[in-house]
Amino acid sequence: MIQKVISLWILLQCEASDLDELSTNSNSKEGTIKFNMRKSLDLEQEGCYLQTGKKECLEECGFNATAKSIFIIHGWTMSGMFESWMHKLVSAVMQRETEANVVVVDWISMAQQLYPDAVNHTRLVGRSIADMLDWLQDETQLPLKNVHLIGYSLGAHVAGYAGTFVQGTIGRITGLDPAGPMFEGADEHKRLSSDDADFVDVLHTYTRGALGVSIGIQEPIGDIDIYPNGGDGQPGCSIGDVLTVAGNFMEVVKCEHERAVHLFVDSLMNKDHMSYAFQCTGPDRFKKGICLSCRKNRCNNIGYNARKMRKRRNTKMYLKTRADTPFGGFHYQMKMHVFDRKLSVDPDPTFYVKLHGAHNDTSGIYVDVPDNKIGLNATNTFLVFTEEDIGDLLKIELSWEGETESWSSILKSLKKNFLSWNTSLNKPVLQVRRIRVKAGETQKKFTFCVPDESKMDISPGESLTLVKCRDGWESKPRKRYENTLRIKYFSFLPFLEKTKSNSNSQTANVMT
């Protein structure tokens, strides 16, 4: 509902902008763009302003052409002031890169307008940044490979225009949930794209669409496009979570859209607790846990620690996060084969797993499978996420949720009773022999088995304990290969014996 209201509001702004096109053109001429080079972590202090063509500013501001140059670009604003995230991001960058030139691109006067008008100004602001970079190259021999543009929302597309207009190739552009309205589906030269820098990484945190509009752009537009929690539904940003703190429905949108900034700040401040994303074709496949591979550069750090991958473009990557900093957690792929030995009438099990590790244990974690339906006599693959590092897995406790007092459970029970007439004889019984696990962050594989093979049965309200029985997974293809070699060897054995016999006869004839 909130998403639809916001989308409708943006669409109405577009209508208003069309009716007031003359005022839009005049405003763009009056707007000012400032390059505020930070000397202090406190944004309340004025800082030092770089101005194209004024060489004395370089010495006054202490600009170091041999160091990294990081430009931070805000987006659309309704308040006309820097939002709190800007203070946090500037502070985090300056603490991580103490020698870097940190410059805040201030285009507040051009961003505090109707949304479509602010969109129309992004090209002009991008060109202004490009002019500044060209001048710095001429005056200081600034290497563009050391330049990193970080843009949030509309600021991401501003960075894209800067990369288009600059003479040369910028080292890196990071897009923090680039704006979606008026950019979704646009030509590459009219938005941020992978051609705008040597390395373009994008974080998508609010891609939920309504009325054909998404606050954050949905399509992949960079070299790598990372979708935390599928790109929407960020933990800690639900209506219940946000309203208890802010009491404003707009804060729900702000929380998810702005989460990209906080994930980036987290990557700067918690470099010893880095978050990993995994290449996958879509959120549904990632939810199955089948994309936790790091082979051939299929995984990457997120945020500031992301690294360029060769010959990659529009690579979609996914991860789950915690609700608060540090946002990083731990991903596990689990494969569980469930047998229905009694051919029960629609047992429809709901499973939970409790993980026991070398450092810690988890509480029960819901086994989330596609369509919320456990496949019987089939292998079920699913993703498990833990917020804490529990160490190497030692034991898994699998529980089948018992029947509850809910109406759905009562109706399901009545249906089973009616069909079977005798519930005691038709009590659903399933078997789970083993669970295979792959840890995404360490890439380690383990197999967990039931200690006593006579006790593999599980029914509603019961649990099974599986212990680690081997490192790695069984390699069935290898066994088939070995059996093939064995068959070929024994089929070839008579020929070898015959050859050996003939050879012995010839040797005996020579000796005589």
What annotation goes with each model-predicted range?
Residues 73-77, 152, 177:
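The conserved beta1-alpha1 loop
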Residues 142-152:
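Alpha/beta-hydrolase fold nucleophile elbow
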Residues 170-171, 177-234:
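The feature captures the conserved acid-bearing segment of alpha/beta-hydrolase catalytic domains
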Residues 128-133, 200:
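Short, well-ordered amphipathic alpha-helical segments that serve as non-catalytic structural scaffolds
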Residues 2-104, 110-121, 131-144, 168, ...:
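Flexible, membrane-associating and regulatory peripheral segments of lipid-active enzymes
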Residues 150-161:
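Glycine-rich nucleophile elbow surrounding the catalytic serine of serine-hydrolase chemistry
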